[in-house]
């Protein structure tokens, strides 16, 4: 309707999305239709800003009905933030990130950014540097905001795997630095969907061998059966690279590699130990 008769929508926004007491069911019905089936465009945001705020702050949605609506509301705001409709000092970000109780919105917001930037079809679409800077600034703002109670946000922090997977934040090693910081945080003890990280970890291996090794070794030793690398050779390729190269600026990397191999073998089940020994012992400095 905004596309067909925009003047009518502008004039009737408050009637379409009423926020007065007693009209909650009307708002729920119209917001449900808009946020799930409507289109987001920059021209809409100015007149819908307070409606987004109401949808976030009002106790409108029950657990079953509301999860998808809450997710899509947060995703809509992530879209508008990326295009510069509002900034880090906006009250809207506070409504999402000021409390760990908004985990549904937080996960959806952070996940949507990484997923939407992923060039999964290989079309080579370029993303404006201004957009990328807005997102890196957002992440750094979020990390600073939760630094004293970050364990309350583990499910949100794990969504950085999408940001790393999308491959848009490589300049200056920003993405690998952020991922390394998360994975190496022993208070968080994060596990991640390793298959999302594999391709970019291999791309980063030559330039950032220590950080890639740290990430892979921590995730392998920390992960459970469902959370290992789907490409079995990523561990082998990393170990082989370290064994076959010298690292004068990191003289402990080779010995750390050997320690990792030994720990990995120690953690192996009896039925898989022989196979793993054949795979990995050849990468020890003294096999």
Language-model segments: residues:
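Non-catalytic all-alpha helical scaffold/repeat segments
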Residues: 1-287
């Amino acid at each position: 309707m905004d596309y067909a008769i925009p003047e009518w929508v502008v004039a009737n926004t408050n009637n379409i999305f009423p926020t007065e007491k007693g009209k909650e069911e009307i708002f729920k019905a119209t917001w449900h239709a808009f946020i799930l089936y409507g289109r987001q465009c920059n021209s809409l945001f100015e007149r819908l800003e307070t409606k987004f705020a109401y949808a976030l702050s009002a106790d409108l949605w029950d657990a079953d009905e509301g999860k998808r609506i809450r997710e899509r509301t947060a995703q809509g705001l992530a879209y508008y933030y990326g295009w510069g409709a509002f900034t880090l000092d906006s009250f809207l970000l506070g409504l999402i990130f000021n409390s760990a109780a908004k985990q549904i919105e937080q996960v959806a917001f952070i996940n949507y950014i990484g997923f939407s930037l992923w060039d999964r079809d290989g079309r080579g679409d370029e993303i404006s540097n201004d957009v990328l800077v807005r997102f890196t600034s957002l992440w750094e703002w979020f990390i600073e905001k939760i630094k004293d109670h970050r364990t309350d946000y583990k499910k949100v922090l794990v969504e950085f795997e999408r940001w790393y997977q999308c491959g848009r934040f490589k300049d200056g090693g920003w993405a690998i630095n952020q991922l390394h910081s998360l994975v190496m945080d022993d208070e968080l003890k994060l596990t991640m969907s390793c298959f999302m990280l594999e391709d970019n970890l291999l791309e980063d291996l030559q330039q950032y061998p220590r950080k890639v090794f740290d990430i892979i070794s921590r995730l392998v030793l920390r992960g459970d059966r469902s959370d290992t690398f789907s490409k079995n050779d990523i561990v082998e390729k990393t170990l082989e690279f370290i064994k076959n190269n010298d690292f004068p600026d990191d003289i402990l990397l080779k010995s750390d590699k050997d320690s990792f191999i030994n720990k990995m073998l120690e953690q192996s089940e009896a039925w898989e130990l022989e196979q793993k020994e054949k795979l990995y012992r050849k990468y020890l400095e003294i096999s």
